[in-house]
Amino acid sequence: MVSRAPREHSPNPAPGYHPKMTATTPLAVLYADEALVAIDKPAGIAVHRSRLVGHDEEYLIDRARAATGRTLYLAHRLDRATSGVLLLAADRDMAAALGQQFMQHAVHKTYLGVVRGWPEPEGLVDYPLDAPGKPGPKPARTRWRRLATTEVAIPMGRYPQQRYALLVLEPETGRYQQLRRHLHHISHHLVGDTTHG
């Protein structure tokens, strides 16, 4: 039997790494002016109350309001498991204007994701998706571009090694869990996705 000392956590984690948010974790405000606030949303916290997320103890919108002392409104959403920049508006009119820009695809969204396997260097998933409680699937499109690949010489299941790729993901629509579901559809599951992976 081999015993190991507990691993020390690096004081400088990798860029984009977010440990689970707790009630005392400060929010990182990336930008703020009289009309907008941009928050670095960590993975693991729901943006707002909804029937899809159940009854969490806290929500990012409440934390942002408490941290800034301002009434703020969501301009868009990010899934609980997703980290990234979240835009908040200082009033309802600004939130509506930003929401329109997202709906009209005037805002370009880019994500990074590590997937299992090596997909083609670039591609497009054009596959309709439905949402819980909504009638029928709606059009959904996601473009991807492969940035890097790696192979790990550790057997898993029937495979003698594991292959992974880093992708740039650009959703052209904004459907429920679109990126995770589209990656599942092309059999290159997002690493860490416990629902579709």
Language model: regions and residue ranges:
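Short beta-strand segments enriched for Tyr within beta-sheet-rich domains
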Residues: 175-183
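A short local structural element in Rossmann-fold oxidoreductases
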Residues: 99, 180, 191
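Phosphate/ribose-recognition catalytic cores of enzymes acting on nucleotide-derived substrates
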Residues: 183-197
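RNA pseudouridine synthases
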Residues: 3-4, 11-166, 170, 183-186
